[in-house]
C-alpha cells in the first residue's frame, strides 16, 4: 500500500490521483511506503534540474530518495518531480498515448526511489526490464519499443 501525496504546481492537464496511485503501487517493492509526487511546469523542473543535476533545461522526472538514518524505522521513500509539459511533448514525439508515458514516468521514478539506476549498461537493462514488466502488468506496451513512422 502506498501513502501518496500528489501536488499539482502545473496548469497542464494531468491524470487523476487514482491513476498516479495505481502506477506508483504497481512499482512498489515493499509492503508500505510514503511518496510525494509533485507535478511542475518547465521553469520549476529546469531550476531543480540545474540545482541537483547541474543540467540545463527541464527534464521529464526527477527522483529525490529519502535517506533514512540507520536504525530509524520509516516508510518515506522520497519525492518525484514530474514536468507535465515535458511528458506531454515526449509522448507526442514518441508516438505513444500520453497516459502511457505518464505511467512510465511514475514507474521509472518509483524504481529510482527504490535504488534502481541506469548509469551503467547492466543496471539500465535490469531497470528497463523491470519497467517493461510493471507496465505490461498495467496493460501497457513496452515504452522502449522502436517507434517507426508510418
Swiss-Prot record:
Cofactor: Zn(2+)
Main EC class the enzyme belongs to: hydrolase
UniProt subcellular location: Cytoplasm
Keywords: Cytoplasm, Endonuclease, Hydrolase, Metal-binding, Nuclease, Ribosome biogenesis, rRNA processing, Zinc
Co-factor remark: Binds 1 zinc ion.
Predominant cellular place of this UniProt entry's protein: cytoplasm
Positions with a binding annotation for Zn(2+): 108, 112, 118
InterPro entries attached to this UniProt entry: MetalPrtase_cat_dom_sf_prd, YbeY, YbeY_CS
GO MF entries: metalloendopeptidase activity; RNA endonuclease activity; zinc ion binding
GO cellular component, as recorded: cytoplasm
Record field: transmembrane: none
Keyword Nucleotidyltransferase belongs to the record: no
GO biological process, one term: rRNA processing
EC number of this enzyme: 3.1.-.-
Family affiliation: Belongs to the endoribonuclease YbeY family.
PANTHER family reported in the protein's UniProt record: ENDORIBONUCLEASE YBEY, CHLOROPLASTIC (PTHR46986:SF1)
Protein role: Single strand-specific metallo-endoribonuclease involved in late-stage 70S ribosome quality control and in maturation of the 3' terminus of the 16S rRNA.
The protein's name in its UniProt record: Endoribonuclease YbeY
Species, as recorded: Methylococcus capsulatus (strain ATCC 33009 / NCIMB 11132 / Bath)
Gene that this polypeptide is encoded by: ybeY
Amino acid at each position: 500500500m502506498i501513502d501518496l501525496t500528489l501536488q499539482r504546481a502545473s496548469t497542464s492537464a494531468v491524470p487523476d490521483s487514482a491513476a498516479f496511485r495505481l502506477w506508483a503501487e504497481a512499482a512498489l517493492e515493499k509492503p508500505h511506503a510514503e511518496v510525494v509526487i509533485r507535478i511542475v511546469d518547465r521553469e520549476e523542473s529546469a531550476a531543480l534540474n540545474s540545482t541537483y543535476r547541474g543540467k540545463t533545461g527541464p527534464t521529464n522526472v526527477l527522483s529525490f530518495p529519502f535517506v533514512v538514518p540507520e536504525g530509524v524505522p520509516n516508510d518515506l521513500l522520497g519525492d518525484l518531480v514530474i514536468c507535465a509539459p515535458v511528458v506531454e511533448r515526449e509522448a507526442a514525439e514518441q508516438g505513444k498515448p500520453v497516459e502511457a508515458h505518464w505511467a512510465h514516468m511514475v514507474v521509472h521514478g518509483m524504481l529510482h526511489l527504490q535504488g534502481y539506476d541506469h548509469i551503467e549498461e547492466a543496471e539500465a537493462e535490469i531497470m528497463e526490464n523491470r519497467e517493461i514488466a510493471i507496465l505490461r502488468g498495467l496493460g501497457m506496451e513496452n515504452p522502449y519499443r522502436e517507434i517507426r513512422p508510418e
